[in-house]
Structure formats: C-alpha cells, structure tokens
C-alpha cells in the first residue's frame, strides 16, 4: 500500500507541474461581495421503472411492477473551478445520495470532499444508465458497498470523505490522458452516517490508457466497518480490471478478491464479471454478461443477455433475460425476465 501511495504521489507532482508551467489563467477577484462567475444551477433527474418475472421457488413469479429509482439532482460551478452536486433518491426510503464540492481547476489534480462514490472498481462510479444491463454486477454489490458481503446495507457504493484525482500525460493526436488516478480517505460507514470508530478507509486506483478508450486498472481498499452489534470487521480488498468504450462498443471485465485481515476474519471471497456491448443500430445495442460470486466456497453464477432500445439520449428501454445458478439459494437454478424503462429530464 505504501509503494502504491508513493508512486501515485510522484505521478501527481510530475503531471501537475507540467500543467501549471504551461497554463496561465486570469484569476477572478475573490470577495464576499462577489456574485459573478457562477453558473446557473442545473436541476434534473431520472426515473427507472421495471417489471420483473422470476420462476425461482417462493418468488411467486414476481416481484412484478416496481419503481427501481427516482433520482433528483442539482449541480453547478463557481469560478469554473469549484463544482458542486446534490443528489436525492425520492422513492422507497427518501434520502440524500450525493453531496460534495470539488475544486477542479486542473485536469491533472482535483480535490473532492463530501459524500460520493467510492473509488473502487470501474463499474461502481457508473451511472445506472451506462451499465448496460438492469443492475450492477455481483462484484460491485458485494465488494463496493451495494449490499456488502460483510452485512452493510446498500450504500449505493458511496461513503463520506475526501478524494484527490486527476488525469496525467496527454499523448497521441487526440491528446488523451495516459494515466488516471484517484485516492480517497473515507469514514468507512457509508452514506449519511458518522464514523463509528475514528479509523478511516483508504481507497485508491491507478489506471493506464494505452489506447484511446481502453483502460487497464488496479484498485486497493484498506479499512474496516462497524456493524450494528458493535463488531469491527476488516475490509481489505483488491480489484483488477479493464474497460473499453469507443464508437458505442463496450467491453468491461473485473476481478475482485478479499485479502489478509478480511480473508482471515470472514473467509475467502472473490468475484468476476465480463460484459460485452455490441451496437446493432444507432438506437439498438445488445449486451451479454457473465457474473460470478464466490464466498466461503459457495458460488453464484448469473448469465444474461440484454437489449437496449436507446431511442433518445434521455429515453431508453431494456429487455433482459437472466439465468441463475445460485448456490446461496435453496433452489439454485432459476430464470428471470426484466423489462426496464429509463427517462431523464
């Protein structure tokens, strides 16, 4: 972990130094009377509705019609350097999902503080619109905090803390960035909760973009979580993955595993998924996905095919078939059909 942090620090200093020497900007006047240099706040949201059929024993062919998500957000910028965002979830148990301010003057180095996505896995930071299938992978759910394997409730892959990130070394005719990094310090308890033990989680990633649109990345997480019984459970995890998104083609694959203290405390666990998205027409894209979770020698495999009918940037319909071989369930083999409607405003 120390070697990773030192390497990332050296890259940040090198990349930021180059940017500062090459960039001259006009500094606005800072004053408590200043009212300019502020964007009009953008207000928006989206709704995801669904119908789900399952032939799993005890599912009663359900759950049927459901509202998966209603999200509302406000974002904007001040001085073009400071960005802010507040996001609410309106359905189910309404709550604040994101709130943060980010100093983002330079692409090479920015600082974000508040409540936001953990910097763990490629898929976790993605918007549900961009995942390609009806839900996040088992890997993200159990290893990034969407119903964690340790028993933490679904925190949407988020926590409260501070994070630095940036993109370094533009290369090629397109001047795409060779290296992306993120390093964050978090409470460890998830959203809308205070730190329970004074310790902090450290999560970081280092990613390389050797070709435009292709990222190879490694992620590390060292921390702990305090459950409702007051027990402190270690979270020590690694993740390795790749993603390719260009010209509407998508390939994404990741592998995550627990290590050291978490492995010895709660048993060995790992997960893997692979997703391929193929554009058929401008409005039709087909995804195929293999999703696997192993926890203490119990295994859940899920295979799916999903058609996305993207009729508009802000309108999408999905039809997905899922086959499960889930040894965590009493009747492991079952089929599901999901139909989803996405609308954004």
Question: What are the functions of these language-model segments?
Answer:
Residues 277-327:
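C-terminal hydrophobic structural anchor segments
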Residues 309, 333-345:
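Outer-membrane beta-barrel "beta-signal"
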């Amino acid at each position: 972990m120390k070697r990773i942090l030192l390497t990332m620090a050296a890259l940040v200093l090198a990349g930021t130094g180059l940017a500062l020497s090459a960039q001259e900007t006009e500094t606005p006047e800072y004053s408590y009377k200043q009212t300019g240099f502020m964007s009009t706040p953008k207000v928006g949201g989206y709704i995801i509705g669904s119908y789900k059929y399952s032939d799993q024993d005890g599912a009663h062919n359900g759950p049927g019609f459901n509202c998966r998500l209603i999200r509302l957000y406000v974002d904007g910028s001040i001085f073009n350097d400071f960005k802010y965002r507040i996001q609410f979830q309106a359905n189910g148990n309404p709550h604040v999902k994101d709130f943060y301010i980010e100093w983002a003057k330079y692409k090479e180095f920015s600082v974000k503080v508040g409540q936001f996505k953990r910097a763990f896995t490629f898929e976790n930071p993605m918007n549900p619109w961009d995942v390609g299938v009806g839900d996040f992978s088992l890997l993200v759910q159990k290893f990034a905090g969407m119903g964690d394997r340790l028993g933490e409730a679904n925190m949407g892959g988020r926590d409260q803390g501070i994070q630095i990130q940036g993109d370094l070394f533009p290369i090629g005719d397109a001047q795409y960035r060779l290296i992306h990094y993120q390093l964050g310090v978090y409470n460890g308890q998830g959203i809308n909760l205070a730190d329970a033990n004074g310790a902090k989680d450290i999560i970081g990633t280092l990613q390389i973009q050797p070709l435009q649109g292709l990222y190879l990345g490694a992620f590390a997480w060292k921390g702990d979580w305090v459950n409702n019984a007051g027990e402190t459970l270690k979270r020590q995890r690694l993740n390795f993955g790749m993603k390719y998104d260009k010209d509407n083609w998508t390939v994404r694959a990741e592998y995550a595993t627990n290590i050291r203290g978490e492995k010895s405390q709660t048993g060995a666990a790992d997960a893997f998924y692979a997703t391929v998205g193929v554009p058929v027409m401008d409005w039709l894209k087909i995804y195929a996905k293999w999703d696997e979770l192993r926890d203490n020698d119990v295994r859940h495999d899920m295979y799916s095919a999903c058609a996305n009918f993207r009729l508009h940037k802000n309108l999408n319909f999905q039809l997905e078939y899922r086959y499960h071989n889930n040894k965590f369930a009493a009747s492991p083999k079952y089929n599901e059909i999901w139909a989803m409607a996405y609308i954004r405003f």
